[in-house]
Amino acid sequence: MQTLFFTMFTAYGLGSLAALLEGRKSFKSLGRGLVALGATAGAGAGLALGAIVIATGVPFALSFPELLPLGGGLALRLDSLGAFFLIVIGVGAIPAALYGAGYTATYEDGRASLRLLGLMFNLFLLTMSLVTLADNVLTFLLMW
């Protein structure tokens, strides 16, 4: 389960970084594709993580007490309720990422900042997924 969590985190992070490639003319289509790939891979990993937690009934927990020690540390825990919402996020994010890759092609002429859109899309999906894993108040507020 830890591998799926880190895959989700890394995929969303790489999708966000790929958005920065979109500013160069030679990488516009590649950048859009990588943004969609990062979002799809991250959502798929989150979907799988949620499905495993629901299927097994075993919660996933990860704690970093040395980070933010005053608030009890950064604590992540995924129980059955959080897993349900992580699945809902994944089910909505995958088609949104795939549709968005084609939809944003019409905005390559510079009318809108596709770099910002791709960056914010992946970061939004990451933080929305991490909110479902928050195990204490400080972690919840940080992810919110």
Placement of each model-derived feature along the sequence:
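Hydrophobic alpha-helical transmembrane segments
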Residues: A19-G23, T127-L133
